[in-house]
């Protein structure tokens, strides 16, 4: 049963990554557009649409943006929520990820992969703030697993003392 659950979780993680890729990279693109991006023949995004300054976009959405609050919330909270499942699933797949530092590194690397893909293939715009928010999302997704793990370890400690 344990192996079956792990295989199911790997499949679930794969589906999650496919959906996340669709939402981040291919949000508004048609199949021909996607092909053009990979052949570098796309004439779309330019460098000034990218953000390499930490907290610039976050500050803009929180304090300066003269846009609908729903759009601001979707952009800020959406990045956090989008990566929370990753932070939740990876510790279930490997004990190596029961350590917060490893979850942070894995989430940051996954987010960086998406951001660099957007930068190189012009699927959107690179934003260092997305990297920050996505990593925060992975950390928040990790918290329930860590709390459950602490509860289980404490419970095992007390039950072994009673025996």
How would you name each of these model-derived features?
Residues 1-123, 128, 142-163:
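Bulky hydrophobic segments
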């Amino acid at each position: 049963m344990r192996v079956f659950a792990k295989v199911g979780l790997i499949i679930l993680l794969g589906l999650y990554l496919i959906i996340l890729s669709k939402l981040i990279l291919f949000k508004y693109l048609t199949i021909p557009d996607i092909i053009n991006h990979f052949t570098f023949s796309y004439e779309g995004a330019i460098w000034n649409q990218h953000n390499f300054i930490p907290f610039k976009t976050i500050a803009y959405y929180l304090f300066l943006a003269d846009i609908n609050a729903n759009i601001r919330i979707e952009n800020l909270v959406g990045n956090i929520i989008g990566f929370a499942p990753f932070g939740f699933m990876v510790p279930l797949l490997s004990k190596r990820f029961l350590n917060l530092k490893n979850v942070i590194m894995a989430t940051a690397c996954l987010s960086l992969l998406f951001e660099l893909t957007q930068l190189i293939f012009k699927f959107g715009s690179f934003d260092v703030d997305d990297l920050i928010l996505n990593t925060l999302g992975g950390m928040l997704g990790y918290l329930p697993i860590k709390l459950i793990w602490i509860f289980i370890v404490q419970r095992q400690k007390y039950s072994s003392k009673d025996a």
